[in-house]
């Protein structure tokens, strides 16, 4: 999560970090990978049958993943792929919430009010004014146009697939994640690497685009957005509780999650249950 503290030389001076040629080559390769991903995968794909996921694996090279995907297909009927560009968790939550609000006007109105509250909170926490006028106002206007009917469902998905507009909207989610952590810094400080403050962590790991979300960011965004999320894991060793799925918040298992994400190593997509009459529950 944090870089190691700089080592001091014999004179007590901090040694300067040296970027090697190999590191530069690796960075270039990583950038090219992101660019290739961007060209081949939309930011937010159309709904697809869950069977497409199963078809990605075979018994010879990925038997465990094939088995898990097949098991999940008994409960989940559709998947919406999200571009893997370092923003996939934030974007998946954004898409999940927008889908809810497209069908639930009261929820949309509540989220607009909440977004205005977060804008004020950002100002109170000392975020630059331009942050609020640019990203927050843009997102709230987007929601208001959904509410007024200016943005149809088709228009919404067009916007969510436009890099410029979609990333402006996405930035709002990074900002409220950062604000939530700063508001609750005493609670979360023990989970941050030694030598780094909550503010430094947010500035380095949350606020910049293309930074993957770790467990701290995941919990914070879900709580800041006021939603309930289930994450299904293809590999149970990645789950915080060692199970096949994990609910956030985890305080009341009787309340169904609103959004379900599928986690594969380093990536999140949105998945959707079959009708209750078709699906059978997966055991932990």
Curated annotation (Swiss-Prot):
Family of this protein: Belongs to the peptidase C65 family.
Segments crossing the lipid bilayer: none
Gene name for this UniProt entry: otub-1
Keyword Hydrolase: yes
Gene Ontology cellular component annotations, sorted alphabetically: plasma membrane
Stated name of the protein: Ubiquitin thioesterase otubain-like
Keywords, comma-separated and alphabetical: Hydrolase, Protease, Thiol protease, Ubl conjugation pathway
Function noted in UniProt: Hydrolase that can remove conjugated ubiquitin from proteins and plays an important regulatory role at the level of protein turnover by preventing degradation. Specifically cleaves 'Lys-48'-linked polyubiquitin.
Domain OTU positions: 77-274
Gene3D superfamilies: Peptidase C65 Otubain, subdomain 1, Peptidase C65 Otubain, subdomain 2
High-level lineage: Eukaryota, Metazoa, Ecdysozoa, Nematoda, Chromadorea
UniProt keyword Acyltransferase, yes or no: no
Domain of life (superkingdom): Eukaryota
């Amino acid at each position: 999560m944090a870089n190691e503290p700089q080592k001091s030389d014999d004179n007590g001076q901090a040694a300067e970090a040296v970027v090697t040629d190999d590191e530069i080559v690796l960075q270039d390769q990583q950038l090219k990978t992101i660019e290739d991903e961007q060209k081949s995968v939309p930011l937010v794909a159309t709904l697809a049958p869950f069977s497409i996921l199963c078809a990605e694996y075979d018994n010879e090279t990925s038997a465990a993943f094939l088995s898990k995907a097949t098991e999940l297909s008994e409960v989940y009927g559709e998947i919406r792929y999200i571009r893997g560009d370092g923003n996939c968790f934030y974007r998946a939550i954004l898409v999940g919430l927008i889908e809810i609000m497209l069908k639930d006007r009261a929820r949309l109105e509540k989220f607009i009010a909440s977004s205005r509250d977060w804008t004020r909170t950002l100002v109170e926490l000392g975020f630059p004014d331009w942050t609020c006028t640019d990203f927050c106002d843009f997102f709230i206007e987007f929601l208001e146009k959904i509410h007024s009917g200016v943005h149809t469902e088709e228009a919404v998905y067009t916007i969510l697939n436009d890099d410029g507009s979609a990333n402006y909207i996405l930035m709002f989610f990074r900002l409220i994640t950062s604000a939530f952590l700063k508001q609750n810094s005493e609670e979360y400080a023990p989970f941050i690497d030694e030598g780094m403050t909550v503010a430094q962590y947010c500035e380095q790991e949350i606020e910049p685009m293309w930074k993957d979300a770790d467990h701290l960011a995941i919990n914070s965004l879900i709580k800041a957005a006021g939603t309930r999320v289930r994450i299904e894991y293809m590999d149970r060793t990645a789950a915080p509780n060692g199970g096949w799925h994990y609910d956030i918040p985890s305080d009341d298992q009787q309340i169904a999650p609103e959004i379900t994400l599928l986690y594969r190593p380093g990536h999140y997509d949105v998945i959707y249950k079959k009708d209750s009459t078709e699906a059978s529950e997966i055991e932990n």
